[in-house]
Amino acid sequence: MAEYKKIVLLKGLESMEDYQFRTVKSLLRKELKLTKKLQEDYDRIQLADWMEDKFPKYAGLDKLIKVCEHIKDLKDLAKKLKTEKAKVQKKKQGKCKTAVKKKGQDELSSSESLFINKESYKSVPSSKKKGKAIAKTEGEKKNKLTQDQDHLPETSGTDIKTEEDCLQNSPKPPPTSPSSSSNKKKRKEITKTEGGKKKKLTQEQAQLPEPLGTDIKKDEDCLQTPPKPPPTPPSSSLNKKRKSRREEETGVKKSKAAKEPDQPPCCEEPTARCQSPILHSSSSASSNIPSATNQKPQPQNQNIPRGAVLHSEPLTVMVLTATDPFEYESPEHEVKNMFHATVATVSQYFHVKVFNINLKEKFTKKNFIIISNYFESKGILEINETSSVLKADPDQMIEVPNNIIRNANASPKICDIQKGTSGAVFYGVFTLHKKKVKTQNTSYEIKDGSGSIEVEGSGQWHNINCKEGDKLHLFCFHLKRERGQPKLVCGDHSFVKIKVTKAGKKKEASTVLSSTKNEEENNYPKDGIKVEMPDYHV
């Protein structure tokens, strides 16, 4: 995925002019779920990080190509991005084929080695193996058996064949014939006189009669046919050697058969690995939000909105602000408590809804905390009872740039709020221009240098104690349009913090002074108060 991100950032976003870049951000705003604030603040690097998190397969390259194709000045750039993407895919396919070919060659060489070992084992004459077993006998018995072999040269092969037939057909083998023992002694003598394996093999082949070799070959074929080797009597060294060879051949077959079923998956594994997209999870402070590739099933919690994404990766942040806890009505119509906070990483800031008021002490200004198992919805983080919030160690602290802190404390312009889409969430501090109390709700008109907009407060935000000129700090208010006119309305998690200003105090003081003056005029006569003094006589 790193190759695709390089294309998006270095050959895509960096090649655009500022106006073109702002156009691309505007067209991708809904797909990337960018708030108006994030849309304005994001630079090319931050947008590339965000696209990588939202579209992990190709780091958002397909989305960027699609948008560029609809912009007249960026059509050539779209073709260039397609070409670069094709180069990366071709390169990856070549690596996959090379890996599969190399894997197949390794397995083929191992199979050939196994086959050669088996064939070389078969090519060794049975007389050589039997000669080794015969070489162990000692003493006078050797000489006696050697003399007996001169009388029966023609029947040795027949006797060996008969012996093998008996081994296959009867549960107990017959005793070894003298001719078989004489053959053993004959091979033993050849072994002693020659001293080398090659010379010994040559003389054995020369002295043994032809029927003997034929019968031994048939004997080998017969030994491979039965499912179980025949029982070996302790007195027969020849039968022991045949049984040993039979077991070794069976073991080779089993080991080869056990390896063969595993070969196709081994060859296919590199191909599947190359075709599957590699998903990366960003847990560093420079990234925006850890990727949703590490998402877990969302626990059943009524505070979590539909479409929220669970992030289990830890994220280190610095606390900028936090409100006091306040009550809100849950979807189960229960009264619960929560508070709002603002946190920041090294690259951006986040508004946070905290539904566990036991964490209030940790959300102290300039505290460094590590959050995990939290949710993200519309760019706002949500922390509940299942989330983890830990205090960061000194070596885990981060340095938040001043421009990030300034952007977090800044309020959006009202003209920008009016241009927003319905359902967008806004935070900020605004001056109260007018207040109109109605039966069901209260209309608060806020104003700044760019324009004015109505804020509709209901429920606990109906007719709050504020005066014209006061500052209203709005948290989590939603944009709504009625008859084409935009206005901000409160939701379940909305909160208002009132900051009384000097203008508001002066307004209130002048109102009180005016009402006092009217009261005095109404209660006191114009001619003043006439007081009669009693006469005192001494």
UniProtKB/Swiss-Prot annotation:
Domain Pyrin: 1-87
Known outcome of mutating residue 245 to M: In strain: BALB/cAn
Tissues showing expression: Highest expression observed in spleen and thymus with moderate levels in bone marrow, lung, skin and heart, low levels in muscle, liver and intestine and little or no expression in brain and pancreas.
UniProt-listed InterPro entries: DAPIN, DEATH-like_dom_sf, HIN-200, HIN200/IF120x, NA-bd_OB-fold
Annotated effect of mutating residue 483 to S: In strain: BALB/cAn
Main location: nucleus
Annotated GO biological process: activation of innate immune response; cellular response to interferon-beta; negative regulation of cell growth
Key words of the record: Growth regulation, Nucleus
Keyword Nucleus appears in the UniProt entry: yes
Region (Disordered): 120-306
Pfam families: HIN, PYRIN
Induction: By interferon-alpha and interferon-beta.
Effect of residue 324 to E: In strain: BALB/cAn
Biased composition (Basic and acidic residues): 135-153, 245-262
Outcome after substituting residue 456 to V: In strain: BALB/cAn
Xref: PROSITE patterns: DAPIN, HIN_200
Residue ranges constituting the HIN-200 domain according to the UniProt record: 299-499
Effect of residue 297 to S: In strain: BALB/cAn
Recorded consequence of changing residue 100 to G: In strain: BALB/cAn
Disulfide feature: none
Keyword Nucleus recorded: yes
Listed GO CC annotations: nucleus
Location within or outside the cell: Nucleus
Primary role: Suppresses cell growth when expressed ectopically.
Family to which this protein belongs: Belongs to the HIN-200 family.
This protein's name: Myeloid cell nuclear differentiation antigen-like protein
